[in-house]
Structure formats: structure tokens, C-alpha cells
Amino acid sequence: MKKLTILILLAMAVVCRASAQNRVVTGTVSEEDGTPLTGAVVQVVGTNNAATAAIDGLYTLKNVPSGAVLRVSFLGYDPVEKKVDADRMDFILKASAQEIASVVVTGMQKMDKRIFTGATDQLLASDVKLDGISEISRGLEGRSAGVSVQNVSGTFGAAPKIRIRGATSIFGDSKPLWVVDGVIMEDVINVDANSLSSGDATTLISSAIAGLNADDIESFQILKDGSATSIYGARAMAGVIVITTKKGTPGITKVSYTGEFTMRMVPSYSNFNIMNSQEQMAVYQEMYDKGWLNYANTVYRSESGVYGKLSQLINTYDPATGQFAVLNTPEGRNAYLRQAEFRNTDWFKELFRNSIQHSHSASISSGSEKGSYYASVGAMVDPGWSIQSKVNRYTLLVNTTQHILKDKLTLNLIGNASYREQRAPGSLSSEVDPVFGTVKRDFDINPYSYALRSSRTLDPDEFYTRNYTPFNIKDELSKNYMDLNVSDVKFQAELKWKITPKVEVSALGAIKYQASSTEHHIEDSSNQAQAYRSMATSIIQSNNPYLYDNPDEPNRDKYSILPQGGIYKRSDFRAKSRDFRASISYNDTFNDKHILNLFGIVEVNAIDRRATSFQGWGLQYDMGETP
């Protein structure tokens, strides 16, 4: 019994001693005028034990040892440290000389906005991001004065036309320079601003930041005027957009997941002023009555629809029935045309589908006095709005900061990578007519353009005529398509040494590798492949522009350069860039009024771009793409 009593008393003594050593500290964090500082971090110095001030500035910190030191910090305010001497401790923070709203991030340094002589805007990523838009650069439209954003294509990977200072050059580029975490983002292929609206295949890899996850971006800094050229040289004559990615917060461990699901509905003709099939047939009938349409001429045209098909069927004999496909009588012709009149094909429903694009992002961040880290992975899956189109993108970002000698020596390591696989309808480069100034594209099968421009009298399952050969848009999309693969990896390290409170030197090194490949498959029975060998009659043979007319043999008829098989085109682009920068800065304030800022820098950049291409004509797709 005595032994049990001694054990109980000993246990009570241990509990009392533990209670005396650890306590719960509560209090408030506010400004000098009493305004609560929501989000201020209260941390036990030397540990990961921390709490965040609530909306009223109140905080509660548990397991605080007696005699410990609390450190309170908040962006834009000078940190405060106090020794724990009571269960309630209130903190009042003073605004620092450089508040966050007054700091300009140029990509090379952070400086007081009061001494920055250029025109600039700072935007938070949360204000720019648009739901359902995977590429965050499109959200800059209307967010900053003088910044014009023109979304020339809805296809993922195609960069929008961005103008910060208007048209800065007649023949040169007018697109801004992108800088991410102090490193210039080089394009894997240089596409000028005018070519962005061309619809060429290269525009799908024209965006410098398509590999960035929008959830990993903290803020944008837009440098608008000529001061940007003093920092980045002539390449910045069209402005600079500086992106800062997220970092870990000391004292707070945060795990987050973001899922976004976007449903895109099939477009509707009700949004466009387009005639229905009955109205179109009325126009065709008027053209026929006035002699603009006749059956004989439509048979040999390079492109024809209902009337061309009617001419073919009138001359198509079916031995099984002993009759022609369409009787060449007023009744027979009118019966066929009446079907087209009331067909009213909805090309949007034929070529588009209701789809759900979903993106997922998971991140973890934490930190202490010794350092912080932020890591995230992301995936975007787009099954495609139109047939024969889809995109999958995967991203990775790791951002760590280590304080080697407290606040004197800091090492920042950033690594990010992305991979994208994409399928899109086949497309050729556009051509400009130098005489008339018109732009044309051969074998254009863009689903959206086709739905807007094609007659609604056409049967979606029938083959009509284009390029002197049978054509059906759904069949062509399945046999004429492009596969793209884009990947990029970047690693950078920055070392900052604060020699004195006023003098700081830094060195940054970065290496980035980008690779993209585009494979254009044009199968044997596609309209494009057959156009190069269409010469059913002498009239078609003499008029088909895709047949070869040998200038050395003027008396010879045109002939095919693709008598059989299909076409395979592949383009590979590689870009390897290296950056090194060393700088020294001096900042001082005299009498709380005068600010002196000196900054010196030396920078070396190098980029190696390589492009290879291959074209294979006559490949047998049904035999494993063999010649």
C-alpha cells in the first residue's frame, strides 16, 4: 500500500512538473493602429511549433516551454521576438520600410517601388486564373492597363497574342519576354507574333509557359515600358512578364489538393447567323434556274456538294437493279434534292461532343527557421472537344530554400518538369498570295471552320468531292491527324550572401532542356493522299494542281508523284539553354527619408536550338508504314 502511494505521488509530481514546463499561450497580433493581422505566423524559435492568427488576430499556441522565445512575422512587417513570461502575449507589428505592395520584382532583383522609374503592375495568380482555362497567360486579358491579349486559338499549347507596348516593330517580334523565377523562358521554336494566328502546326508548341501548372504560380509582375530593356536588353522591347512561383511558409505545414472539372457543351448554330438547309437549297435552285449551276460542269469541279453528287449518281449504273442510282428525270432529280432540302445537318453535333476536362494538383509545403520547401504534382486530362483531338499534361515542381548561416547565406533550389502528349487534326502551313494578299491553306480540315462554312444540305455519312477526289470530313479526320509530344526540364540554383545588412551578393545558375516532336500521319485512303493521284479524266488531269507538270517535258501530261501509299511527316525541335548571373546590391536609408540603391550585374546566356525534319512519301499505312 505504501509502495502504491509513493508511485501515485511520483506520477503527480511528474505531471505537475510537465504542466509547469509547457503552457498554452494565447493573444492577438495587430498593427500599430489596432487592425488585426490575419495570417500572421507565431512560432516558437528553434522548433516547428507555430500557429496562424485568425481573422480577428487571435492565436493559440500549445505546448510552449517556459522561457521559450516567440517570433511573430507577417509579410510587409518587421518581425518581433519576445520571451514567454505569461499565458497571454499580445504583439504589435510595425510596417517595414519595404512593404510587399511596394516591392517590384524585375526577375533579377527586388526593389522599392518608390525608386523604380518604370511602369509596372503586380497581379496575383488568384486574380488572373480563369476557371476551365489550363494556360494561365490567357487570363491576363483586361487585368492590366495597356496589356492586350488576343486568344487566336482555343487549342491547348497555342500562345495568345499579347501586346504590352503595342506594335513595337513592323517586321520583328512584338511578343513579351517571359521570366520565371528570375530565368528567361526561351521558346523551343521561335514563332513570330503574326504566325500565332496562322493555324500552323508549330503554333501548338509556341507557348513558353504551357508547361507551368497554374496552381504553382504566386504572382505576375508586368514591366511595361522601356525600363525593361535596361534590364534584359533588346529582347525586352515589347515588355516583360515576370512570374514568381510558390514557396513554403516557415512554421506552417500545408497539404492541399485542387480538382477542377470543366464541361464543354457542343456548339449550337443558334449562336451564328447561318442559313439552314432549306434556305440554302432555295439559293441553289435560283442559281440553277439562272444557269449558274448545271450538271455537266459540277462533275469536273475540284469541289462539289449536293449538285455534284447528283451528277455522279445520274451517271452511276447499278447492274444489280439494272437502273441508274438516280433517274435523270424531273421527278428523280427533285426527289434527291428534296432529301437534301430537309436534311439540315448539324455539323457541330457530328464533329463535336460534350466533354469533361479535368485537372488535378496536389502540393505540400512547410518550413522552419532553417529553411522551407514547396512541392507539387499536377495532371490535366482533356479528352477533346472535337473528334480526333485530346491533350494530357503532367507537371512537377520542387522549390526549396535553405538558410545555411541563418539570414546571411541562403540557397534556393528550384526544379520543374512537364510532359505533354496531344493529338490534333492534320494541318499544313498557310500560304499568302503576294498579289491579292489573301491567305489560304490546302487540305484544311479544322472541325470548327468546317462546321461554320459547310453546307447543311450535305449528308454527314456521304462522300462528296474536294480536290477532285472523294471527301468526307469524319473519314478524313480519322486518316489525317497529328501527334505531338512536348517535354521540358529546368533546374536552377541561386546562392545569396548577405555580407552586411546593406550589402548582398548573389549568383544564379540555370539549365533548361526542351524537346518536341510532331508526327503528321496522312493515310493512303485520305483525301489529301488521293488528291496527289486523282486523274480519272483528262479534264481532271489537266486541272489538278497536285499533279506534277515536268517543265523539262512540256509535251508530257501531268503525272502523280504519289501513285500509291500515304505521307508521313515528322518534325523534331530541341532547345538547350544555359544561364549564369552574378550580382551585388547595396541598399541604405538615410534619416528615414533618403534611399540609396546600387546594383551591379554580369550575366551570360546561351541557347542551342536544333531542328530536324523528315518526309516519307508512298508509305503503306495498312502494312505498318512500310515504303
Task: Please tell me what each predicted stretch does.
Residues S174-K175, V191, P250-E341, G384-S389, ...:
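Surface-exposed loop/interface segments of Gram-negative outer-membrane beta-barrel transport/assembly proteins
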Residues G367-K370, I404-K406, W497-V503, D588-D592:
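Outer-membrane beta-barrel strand-turn architecture
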Residues S365, W497, S506, A611-T612:
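Intrinsically disordered, low-complexity Ser/Thr/Pro-rich tracts
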Residues K161, L177, S372, K502-G509, ...:
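Beta-sheet entry/capping signal
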